Structure formats: C-alpha cells, structure tokens
C-alpha cells in the first residue's frame, strides 16, 4: 500500500527551509525569485503578489533549470534563491522539492501560500501579473 500524499508532502518538506510570508518579502528584497504557480482563476480570486513571476506548474522545471534551453532569463544559476508559492502552500512544497532535485539547492516555498500572505496583511500587486509562457 502506498504511504499516501501526506507522506510525500512530509518527505518534500524535510529538505526545505520554508519561509513565512514576511521572510519571503525579505528574501525577494535580497534578490530571490518569487515564483507563483497558481492558475489564472486562482490569481483572479486571490490577487497577484508584487514582484512574482507566474510560471505554470507543468513547465516549472524547464523554465527554472539554468541548463534548459527553455529557461527564463532570470534562471541564471543553480545557486539562485527561489521561493515558490501556490494557493495554500502544499503544491509549492512539492514543486520546490522537485527544483532541488534538479540542483537548485536554494529552492524553497512559502508557508501558507498566498492565503498566508493575505492573512499576514501583506500587500497585493496593483500591476498586472508577470506571466511567463
């Protein structure tokens, strides 16, 4: 019998130094990439985060792997700090663990996702999202 998704999530998080929303703000100010993997519908419902780059979860690894021909220009090296966010902080943990497996050792996610950001009273963006194909 499979150990289940909770065990998978626990294993993924065991290798992450997850950040609070306020720690995420500080990390982004220090140069970390803030990557939003939420769908357009969820971004419309919750709002966009200032400075976030929106990348669809299905292509995340290709866009952030510095060795990939499909990387975004900001994917400059394996030592780049990356903070992944989703709605509630579950799928972002799995995504960050996958990025670490690629060699992006400083990839992590934000505790509580965008809902945690909102609950912490942090501002949402007043500008259109930076959506990358």
Model-found features: residue ranges?
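Rhodanese-like catalytic fold shared by cysteine-dependent sulfurtransferases
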Residues: 1-33, 40-81, 90-133
């Amino acid at each position: 019998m499979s150990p289940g998704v909770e065990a998978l999530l626990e294993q993924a998080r065991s290798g992450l130094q997850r950040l609070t929303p306020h720690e995420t703000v500080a990390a982004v100010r220090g140069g970390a990439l803030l990557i939003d993997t939420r769908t357009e519908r969820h971004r419309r419902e919750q709002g966009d985060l200032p400075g976030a780059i929106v990348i669809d979860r299905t292509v995340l690894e290709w866009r952030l792997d510095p060795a990939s021909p499909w990387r975004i220009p900001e994917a400059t090296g394996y030592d780049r700090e990356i903070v992944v966010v989703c709605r509630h902080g579950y799928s972002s943990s799995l995504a960050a663990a996958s990025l670490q497996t690629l060699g992006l050792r400083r990839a992590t996610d934000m505790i509580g996702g965008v809902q945690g950001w909102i609950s912490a009273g942090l501002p949402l963006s007043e500008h259109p999202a930076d959506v990358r194909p």
